[in-house]
A protein has these predicted regions:
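Short, His- and charge-rich active-site/binding loops that engage polyanionic ligands
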Residues: 73, 78-98
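Sec-dependent N-terminal signal peptides
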Residues: 4-13
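Domain-level detector of nuclease and nuclease-like folds
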Residues: 89-152
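Hydrophobic alpha-helical membrane context
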Residues: 14-15, 115
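N-terminal module-boundary/linker segments of secreted carbohydrate-active enzymes
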Residues: 17-80
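A short, polar/charged loop/turn motif at coil->beta-strand junctions and beta-hairpin connectors
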Residues: 6, 68, 95-98
Length: 152
């Protein structure tokens, strides 16, 4: 029992120690109230740079790179994709042909609108064939599996 409490305590301690905002990030909000707080917060995030759909290819090199330098595909165990070389070549007629960009929430749900369309927090490199097969279905549990990707 002591072992479990120690592990939980360490886990919580590490989690909370990393959950601190950048030093000075909220300084402009200190002492303000109501509308002034809203304005100060808006000003703090005003320098956000909206990514283009094309920018995501380069962003994936940082966000979804495996330790061996290959693309981290969330749908398939076919993991030989090379950044730049294997990105959406227009193929995708079979699993393992190439990878493309996947929205975690179907883009039709927000009418392909910006900034959601290129929000990197909701974008993943995925096997093109499996991504196209998924269509606009939400993530969730299914009663009967009709198609399953390699390892998925």
């Amino acid at each position: 029992m002591k072992k479990y409490l120690l592990i939980i305590s360490l886990w919580l301690g590490i989690g909370f120690s990393n959950a601190q905002p950048l030093s000075g990030y909220y300084d402009s909000v200190d002492g303000k109230k109501a509308q002034a707080v809203k304005t100060a917060l808006c000003d703090a995030i005003d320098e956000h740079t909206q990514r283009t759909y094309k920018d995501l290819w380069a962003d994936f090199r940082t966000t979804d790179c495996r330790p061996d330098g290959k693309v981290w595909d969330m749908y398939s165990s076919i993991t030989h994709y090379v950044f730049g070389t294997d990105q959406n070549t227009g193929g995708g007629g079979r699993e393992g042909a190439d990878y493309n960009r996947e929205h975690s929430m179907p883009k039709s749900w927000f009418h392909d609108g910006y900034p959601m369309y290129t929000d990197l927090f909701h974008m993943y490199p995925t096997d093109s064939y499996i991504n196209n097969m998924r269509g606009n279905y939400p993530f969730g549990e299914v009663g009967t599996v009709t198609k399953q990707s390699n390892g998925g």
